[in-house]
Amino acid sequence: MGTLHGRLGPRLLMATALVGGLGMVQAAHAQDAPNFEVYGFAQVDFTQDFNRVDPAWDDALRPSKIPTTQGTFGDNGQTSISVKQSRFGVKAQQDIAGKPLFVQFEFDLFGVGGDAGQTTFRLRHAYGQWGPVLAGQTNSVFMDGDIFPNTIEYWGPTGMVFLRNPQIRYTFGSGPGQFAIAVEKPGNDIDPGNIRTVSPELGANIRGDESLPDLTGHYRYQGDWGHVQLAGILRRVGYETVGATDNKPKNTKLGWGVNATSNIKVGAKDVVHLGVVYGEGIASYMNDGGTDMGPEAATGVTLPLPTPVPPGSLRGDVLPLLGLTAYYDHYWNDQWSSSVGWSMTKVDNTDFQEATAYTYGQYASANLLYTPDPRILIGGELLWGERKDFNDNKGDDLRVQVSFKYSFSSKDFR
């Protein structure tokens, strides 16, 4: 218990106190605020990995974290039991000045970034929407979260756009067709590549240029048959060298992308999830794999470069990326269901990225889920992933996950 308490840290304790206080408010004013809800679930995942991935990512299958050199993370085989998917949230809705106000705050325990591998507070949603205006952190306008399949593995298909991002959004229309536009927080992922080898100091000082927000938009049409969505993004992707005169070398490029997605209903409950995304400099918005910009030799320059690197020999270029997702959710009856599908990401690397740079990833899964009650889910899932590097080295991973999920809502106790 002491070890887990230390890993959770003060952020989770403060968050627990916050939602606990909100829960008491909800209990005291249930009749006055019927649209206030406290919700969440406790989930435990048992994962048996037959190969190995980066130990910080044992509890998720990310192709980008699969080693392409045997033994990088030890012998094959790894067991993990995790509660990181467990979730807690609050949401409220009421009319103000004739327009609906919706507010949501939600977190889980899946550490990422500097907290990767830890069971710790991770903010998912923190936003409000009053009428057509939304402000805060939630799903990117470039993303279609509804194509996420009925799977139990946390990270999900590699080839879909998936990013919860701080944004300011405006939505037009309230019928079956809606158009949304937003400015979103920029977050360039720059790969110095082989610059780190020929000039370590230069490579260490390259930083992303995030001087302008990303511009996103989508059109979505919804019907009894499902929905279709077409989304686009324009963004400034660039880099600069901190500590250097005039911050040079530096460069910027236009990043852009198009994301076409759809859910198609089949029969009473079955759903086909489809998605195809293509663009340049959009890896930051992908669920897994790739980088926005990489180094490329200027025209007429041959490799290898001399040391120090001659001025103008290298430039940054945005990387083309293709992502595909196809899944089928089937319901055997009211209690049993399955989801099966495949996803991929393909990156067109620049000529001066390192040989170990990520270039291709695959993700596939199939499951059987039992839901005796809407608040209870028990299921097993077979997963496979593969990574391919710029130098054509490959690595794959095979694993089985068994999960138990128990959900709750304050509405269940009224």
Residue ranges and their predicted role:
Residues 31-58, 62-193, 209-227, 263-267, ...:
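Outer membrane beta-barrel
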Residues 49-53, 114-116, 144-148, 188-193, ...:
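Outer-membrane beta-barrel proteins
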Residues 100-111, 185, 230-236, 337-350, ...:
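Transmembrane beta-strand segments that form the barrel wall of outer-membrane beta-barrel proteins
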Residues 123-125, 165-167, 212-216, 253-261, ...:
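Transmembrane beta-barrel architecture of outer membranes
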Residues 223-358, 414:
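Detector for outer-membrane/organellar transmembrane beta-barrel domains
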Residues 396-414:
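Outer-membrane beta-barrel "beta-signal"
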